[in-house]
Regions:
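C-terminal motif of bacterial Sec signal peptides marking the signal peptidase cleavage site
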Residues: 17-20
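Bacterial signal peptide processing site
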Residues: 22-25
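Internal, hydrophobic beta-strand segments that form the core of beta-sheet-rich folds
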Residues: 126-138
């Protein structure tokens, strides 16, 4: 399983935060997976500065995978403290990367495909620095 996520999936967890009212992107960041792979014990951290209070945000993550990724899906555990800086909300999410026939979902070119995973929404009550933590469940 160690090599499962090596070189064939890039979690660009471009953890996107979009203001619900006007579709403006509040935060977008990219992290690639090391060439030695994404180990089960590895966590991706995204530190998100929020300048507005009482903002309703739509949350999503983007994943890029190469066509040699051996599985149709990926499970992600996503934690964030957007609604209260001292309380963590955690969800386990499933992203279907390919259909049953092996056709990749999302958009792509050549052997690279990108899919978007909606995470949900959150109300940020105070400006501040917030964090996303993402691990895989494969």
């Amino acid at each position: 399983m160690k090599n499962l996520l090596r070189n064939s999936i890039w979690i660009l967890l471009a953890t996107c935060l979009t203001a619900a009212c006007n579709e403006n992107t509040v935060y977008h960041s990219y992290q690639s997976i090391p060439t030695e792979g994404w180990k089960k014990s590895d966590t991706l951290f995204f530190n998100v500065p929020i300048k507005d209070s009482l903002a309703l945000l739509q949350l999503s993550a983007e994943i890029r995978n190469e066509s040699n990724y051996a599985y149709r899906n990926i499970y992600l555990t996503v934690s964030h403290n957007l609604e209260n800086s001292t309380v963590w909300k955690t969800d386990t999410l499933l992203l279907i990367l390919a259909d049953k026939e092996g056709k990749w979902n999302g958009t792509g070119w050549g052997s690279l495909f990108q899919s978007t995973l909606p995470i949900g929404s959150a109300i940020v009550r105070h400006p501040g620095n917030y964090t996303f933590k993402i691990t895989h469940g494969m």
